[in-house]
Amino acid sequence: MSCSISLSFPDGSKRNYPAEMTGLELAESISKSLAKKAVAYSLDGITRDLSDSLGQSGQVEIITREDSRALELIRHDCAHVLAEAVQELFPETQVTIGPVIENGFYYDFARQQPFTLDDLTIIEKKMREIIQRNKPFRKEIWSREKARRVFSEKKEFYKVELINSIPDNQDLKIYYQGEWFDLCRGPHMQSTGQIGNAFKLMKVAGAYWRGDANNPMLTRIYGTAFANENDLKAYLHMLEEAEKRDHRRLGREMDLFHFQEEGPGMIFWHQKGWKMFQNLINYMRRRLDDHQYAEVNAPQVLDRSLWEISGHWGWYKENMFKAIPAAEDLDHEHIYALKPMNCPGHVQIFKHGLKSYRDLPIRLAEFGLVHRYEPSGSLHGLMRVRSFTQDDAHIFCTDEQLAAECLSINDLILSTYADFGFKEISLKLSTRPEKRVGSDALWDHAESIMESVLKTIETKFAGQIKTSILPGEGAFYGPKFEYTLKDAIGREWQCGTTQLDFNLPERFGAFYIDKDSEKRQPVMIHRAIFGSMERFLGILIENFAGHMPLWLAPEQIVVATITSEANEYAQKITARLKAVGLSATTDLRNEKINYKIREHSLQKVPVILVCGKREAETNSVNMRRLGSPNQTLLSVEDAIKQLSNESTPPDLQRVINA
């Protein structure tokens, strides 16, 4: 006798079904057209193969190809088809792993001769053939003995290693697509034909097996796939636009910074780049002052013992830089480390001197330079470096002050992003992971506060910010908010964080005296807005395509002469611009004015003031904006007034206009 289960549907209805019914049979019972469009089903939020039995009661939903959740399946299946195509064309190739990643997928292959870009065209053609065959995906559960034997006979030794690493309590799944098969956790769609043709192989790269430089080098083929051609075209167009906006190229053209092999992941800031960096710091320093933060500075180098207390030496050591004094190089009496994070130093500052509940909240902020070892292959311009500056802050407060502090941080973060033109923001609350410190009661309390804060934010900023909850994604020491912004070409960047910490104050014995004269452990909030200031500057350069807002631009104005007869006049104008706080230089070179304009435009100078004999006689200038072929004739007074207003940072504009 079959067991009956109760299923809840998205429309709120509930029905009973046999437990052994499959997802496909469920779809067919609803409608034949739904079954034809179905690619998988979801039970209590977990995506499953349509061939899987339902097995239990729960919230069920049929996933069709138009569903956003189908995109991961399309890409996953595409990775399998890529592997089959490679082995059809190059039979000696071993397949290893092929996961879905952001915006696409990849597959790593082991062969003596690495693939080239020319090979991708051939492989892609073969993939389209395989998709056209429309072979069904079929799942089998194998014993470990059978799996080891079959893959060993195929000389798929990387797969054998993977099989040996799978825990005994997990099923060993094999997915067929026609005659070809692969080891895989699944799930998959019904057939290769459901993938469609909206895919493209993107590039070839090297990758170490399991990311370990001691292991063999493999060839990685990257690809992308979408549900339809329009989405694929939009993505490829975005990539073209991103290449034009690449901050590394613009950094060279604008003479902002450079890197060199003696300091991998370390930035050499040039004058203009450093000016932009300082503009960012000055902006944030004013915002922090308005929100009653105390700016501090903790040492760059600290003894290992402190990092052992904080826990970093145990769980973050491989990402840290050791520092051993040269005089002690042999006996290693002291081992120091360059700080990878600012938080332990801020706890020491909080502990210096007795604190009362009346002193709280205490908000400590630092533009702290931190060092983290990143693999050389992951370094990427300003976006991924080994030495960077965090706009870090740590708030020490009472439990009763926690919600208000989180809301205040939220307001500061959102207004900051708005000042830089970012209007599409998403906020995610990450809750307790499996491995964590602190009691369940402590987590229950903290999460209830954070969820309450999230609801308040949703109400206050209705329609302006997208919110979601990510179960199990919090840090081991507390739940957190993550802020993600969308740039001018639709890319998302995770920047701001608000992170509760139950761990560090306890480790260092931080306390304050409460109203009953008892010692109490403060609540500690980690908070960042830009995150890495270097990375945020890279995001800004790409978002604005180098055409920075006047207040942030490293070189705001160039006064360029048409003739030497206007040289003295141009110098006087430049002096007047500087006198009102504008960044201006004079170009008196004996070059044609079009040459000067073209050169300064390449360097992304926002405003060029053109001066000739006529302008000198009429006390005027011709203003030319970056990206515009037009010039506007203005009096010097009007030009200075206009540019002074534009160059005022947005936070100061609010004060002026209040």
UniProtKB/Swiss-Prot annotation:
GO terms for molecular function: ATP binding; metal ion binding; threonine-tRNA ligase activity; tRNA binding. Residues 246-549 are annotated as: Catalytic. It is an enzyme of class 6 (ligase). Binds 1 zinc ion per subunit. Zn(2+) binds at C343, H394, H526. Residues 1-64 form the TGS domain. It catalyses: tRNA(Thr) + L-threonine + ATP = L-threonyl-tRNA(Thr) + AMP + diphosphate + H(+). It is found in: Cytoplasm. Catalyzes the attachment of threonine to tRNA(Thr) in a two-step reaction: L-threonine is first activated by ATP to form Thr-AMP and then transferred to the acceptor end of tRNA(Thr). Also edits incorrectly charged L-seryl-tRNA(Thr). NCBIfam families: thrS. PANTHER family: THREONINE--TRNA LIGASE, CHLOROPLASTIC_MITOCHONDRIAL 2, THREONINE-TRNA LIGASE. Homodimer. Belongs to the class-II aminoacyl-tRNA synthetase family. This is Threonine--tRNA ligase. It comes from Bartonella tribocorum (strain CIP 105476 / IBS 506).
